[in-house]
A protein has these predicted regions:
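A short, Lys/Arg-enriched amphipathic alpha-helix followed by its capping loop at the start of a domain
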Residues: 15-24, 51-54
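Short, hydrophobic alpha-helix immediately C-terminal to the catalytic nucleophile
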Residues: 13, 17, 107-108
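Conserved N-terminal glycine-rich FAD pyrophosphate-binding loop of Rossmann-like flavoproteins
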Residues: 33-53
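Adenine-nucleotide cofactor-binding loop residues
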Residues: 11, 32, 127
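Glycine-rich FAD pyrophosphate-binding loop
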Residues: 20-40
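Beta1/beta-strand and adjacent pyrophosphate-binding region of the FAD-binding site
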Residues: 1-11
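Conserved N-terminal helical subregion
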Residues: 1-3, 49-150
Length: 150
């Protein structure tokens, strides 16, 4: 099946990865002109970590990530009011399957896992979808038109 996925952040390329391995032809469309940079640091563990393991991404995520040893709350004068060791709290509960990573690094790793096998349309977005019995006719904001099965 030819499948259009809107968004090339984290979820879009992850879905494309699994669809490709299931014999489908995914295409990503992303409004931004390139993969987005920046974003917050996210704590990555649980179900997402398990998916990353299955995709073979964990070594890269651990290398790109951060092992935050202490979080502090400080007063206006800089005096420490409270502190927390997230490795002790979260890492213990996650059995070592935990990393803090920049959102853009996580997105880049998932996108790179596609290894150039998925067409990505940057700088465009879906303007209209018309469903028929056997396909979806998609008109992009750029004026381009394509047909997909889903």
């Amino acid at each position: 099946m030819k499948i259009l996925i809107v968004g090339a952040g984290i979820a879009g390329p992850t879905l494309a990865y699994w669809l490709l391995r299931s014999g489908h032809e995914p295409t990503l469309v992303e409004r931004a002109p390139a993969l987005r940079e920046g974003g917050y640091l996210v704590d990555f563990w649980g179900a997402g970590f398990e998916v990353a393991e299955r995709m073979g991404l964990v070594p890269r995520l651990m290398a790109d990530g951060y092992r935050v040893r202490e979080m502090r709350e400080v007063s206006n004068s800089g005096k420490r009011i409270a502190h927390l060791n997230p490795l002790r709290v979260i890492d213990g509960a996650a059995a070592g399957r935990f990393v803090s990573i920049a959102r853009s690094d996580l997105a880049r790793a998932t996108y790179d896992s596609l290894d150039g096998q998925v067409e990505t349309i940057f700088g465009d977005t879906v303007d209209e979808i018309t469903e028929t019995e056997d396909h979806a006719a998609v008109r992009f904001a750029s004026g381009a038109a394509r047909e997909f099965d889903l």
